[in-house]
């Protein structure tokens, strides 16, 4: 994503992430439309989309191979700017970013796993309605990711990160005490706000560790998201 970004790393990162977020959002909708009426065997049709994605990924890999040398030079230029900071400061900053992503992943995993059960238990809605509500929340997450990436490039990533952290807190505290329409509306706002900083955090991390995209991806997509999922199981 960053190879194709030009000077808009935040937007490129957000577009990359919205693929996963968009898939997560469509999942509950497809479950309500296909799996509930037709059974689990309907999932087999999704293999066609996976085959198409594999073919697309092969083409992207060919392009990636040709661009790798140019991107390495760009990473070296970024590395010269980061060199003014000590290794200790860089590692502390990276650890803070990991904690931020972990907290967001923890909340997202909790909402994805339990939001439908919360709606069914508190408001007595059907499984189909609860899945559609989860779809609305996850769609807001996908939209917030793209908007946050664009705003981070335009106004600065630091402001987006702080706004995402502090902006979601009051809505999160209000969520258990609202009626059904306001609960859904508030969940959508939370999804928009809490996801807006994902791309900004990841771009910051790749700038702190230029040329170490694999390590950064492992820390933020693997470790943080994995720990967030494990943490949500205890609540």
PLM segments and residue spans:
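Intracellular juxtamembrane helix-capping segments at the cytosolic ends
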Residues: 1-5, 196-209
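Cytoplasmic helix-loop-helix junction between adjacent transmembrane helices
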Residues: 1-19
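Helix-loop-helix hairpin linking two adjacent transmembrane segments in secondary transporters
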Residues: 16-63
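Flexible cytoplasmic inter-helical loops of multi-pass small-molecule transporters
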Residues: 46, 59-83
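Extracytoplasmic gate region of multi-pass secondary transporters
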Residues: 91-135
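Helix-to-loop junctions at the C-terminal end of transmembrane segments
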Residues: 145-156
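Structural signature of the two symmetry-related core transmembrane helices
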Residues: 159-173
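A late C-terminal transmembrane helix in Major Facilitator Superfamily
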Residues: 211-235
């Amino acid at each position: 994503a960053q190879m194709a970004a030009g000077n808009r790393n935040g937007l490129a990162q957000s577009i990359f992430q919205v693929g996963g977020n968009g898939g997560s959002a469509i999942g509950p909708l497809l479950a309500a439309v296909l799996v509930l009426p037709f059974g689990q065997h309907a999932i087999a049709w999704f293999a066609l989309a996976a085959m198409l994605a594999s073919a697309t990924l092969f083409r992207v890999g060919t392009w990636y191979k040709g661009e790798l040398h140019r991107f390495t030079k760009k990473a070296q230029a970024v590395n010269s700017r980061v060199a003014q900071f000590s290794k200790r400061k860089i590692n502390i900053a990276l650890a803070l970013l990991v904690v931020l992503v972990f907290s967001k992943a923890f909340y997202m995993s909790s909402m994805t796993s339990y939001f439908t059960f919360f709606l069914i238990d508190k408001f007595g809605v059907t499984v189909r309605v609860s899945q559609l509500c989860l779809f609305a929340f996850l769609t807001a997450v996908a939209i917030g990711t793209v908007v946050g990436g664009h705003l981070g490039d335009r106004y600065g990533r630091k402001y987006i990160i702080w706004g995402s952290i502090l902006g979601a807190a009051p809505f999160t505290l209000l969520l258990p005490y609202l009626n059904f329409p306001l609960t859904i509306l508030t969940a959508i706002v939370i999804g928009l706000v809490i996801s807006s900083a994902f791309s900004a955090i990841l771009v910051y991390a790749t700038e702190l560790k230029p040329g170490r995209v694999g390590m950064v991806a492992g820390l933020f997509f693997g470790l943080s998201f994995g720990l967030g999922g494990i943490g949500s199981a205890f609540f």
